[in-house]
Amino acid sequence: MYRDASLFRFGTNRCSLKIEESIGENLKNATFVAVSCVWKIKNGKERASMKGKDDVFKKFHESFAKMEGHFHILEQRIPVELQMEYFKYSANVRKENQPPRPLSEEECEMIYETLLNGETEEREEKRHLLSVLATAKSIRAYRLLEEYAQCADPEVTDWACMALMESRIALESEFSDEKQIYISTGLGGKGEKLRFYVLMLSKGKRPFEDYQRTTIEKEFAYSLPQSNCEIERIAVGEQFVELEFLVPVKEDVKRVLDRVINECNQYGDFLSDVYTVTNVKELTQEEIAEIINKDESFKTSN
């Protein structure tokens, strides 16, 4: 059964969980999980909204901790909405089954030639051909998609990446008894790790001192690898810290961040215990400024 999707949407003051099981009957032993989340959370045990049924971090962590199988995470940064559009579209292509699957190597080559030789100029037609190859149940189709993804037309680059991923999952689910789990996020990931963007502010909106900047850089560089996390980017601004890092799928993101923030605050209590985490997109400088200026929780030093 191919499931589309467990979609988590978490906001500052709300938590909603939407599950749809709508596409795919011919892809055995595979699950599609779309995760789109933004949290603003408070370090420690003080925030009531993080309790019981409203503990969105707990729901997020447990949803993956209970999953067993081979995780696939798209490395490219493709909007979740486009990813879900792709899988719904490819489900219809599988259902139509025209030409009948599995496709022969010759059929795959003909489709690929049509993509390359300019006979197809419309974006929708290119999308259709890519989805046909993705659902071909053919190793040759996978190799052709792999080749095309390296030089895809800009208007279908994301679609080609999705087609390549689907083809890989389809083949692995066909030849392996292990469950295949595809995790879709806006920021993507690497291997079996999800990419998160984190915004942390200084306590009381006070500018960081030099020793505090050094402490942040050293503590994060030391602490995060202890949980098998990888820092891709850390930038310490005047009043805020931006972190982009990779986290193992089954790791508790909140626990990891709480621990390193607490360690930093042993040296002067200068990081706010409220921070923002998302796997949708990086925040722009304008969005960061808006958070600093409008969020009441940062207007006091308490």
PLM features per residue range, with description:
Residues 50-127:
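Extended repeat-based scaffolds of very large eukaryotic assembly and lipid-transport proteins
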Residues 85-102, 125-137, 147, 158-170:
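Structural detector for internal amphipathic alpha-helices that build alpha-solenoid repeat scaffolds
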Residues 226-285:
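Short, intrinsically disordered low-complexity segments
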Residues 121-125, 141, 155-156:
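Positions within the helices of HEAT/ARM-like alpha-solenoid repeats
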Residues 70-74, 104-116, 138-150, 173-178:
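Amphipathic alpha-helical scaffolding segments comprising HEAT/armadillo-like alpha-solenoid repeats
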